[in-house]
């Protein structure tokens, strides 16, 4: 059985000592092997509060969202050739439909 006195001041030990301690406590994982990650796992396993050796995670100030205003777009100047064809086709279909409706009345 391991005691916490063996792993006291783990932050000041070398990387090799930390990895050995992590393997002893069965918290050494293949994915994250950074010194800070191993220290956190060891302290979590032993029930000690995590220290501030890891980089502090200060939350960034909330950035105000940019206000987007839609400017009226001109129909022909801002569209690509393909978009123009589609809109022209739709307009023609609408006009034909309106003419058919007028003829039916």
Swiss-Prot record:
Q: Tell me the superkingdom of the source.
A: Eukaryota
Annotated segments matching region Disordered: 45-105
Acidic residues bias (residue ranges) = 95-105
Q: Which regions are flagged for Low complexity bias?
A: 49-84
The name on file for this protein is Uncharacterized protein DDB_G0286463
């Amino acid at each position: 059985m391991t005691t916490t006195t063996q792993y006291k001041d783990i932050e000041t030990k070398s990387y090799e000592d930390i990895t050995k301690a992590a393997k002893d406590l069965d918290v050494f994982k293949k994915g994250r092997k950074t010194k800070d990650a191993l220290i956190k796992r060891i302290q979590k396993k032993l029930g000690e509060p995590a220290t501030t050796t890891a980089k502090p995670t200060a939350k960034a100030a909330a950035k105000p969202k940019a206000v987007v205003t839609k400017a009226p777009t001109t129909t022909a100047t801002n569209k690509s050739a393909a978009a123009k064809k589609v809109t022209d086709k739709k307009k023609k279909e609408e006009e034909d439909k309106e003419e058919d409706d007028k003829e039916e009345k």
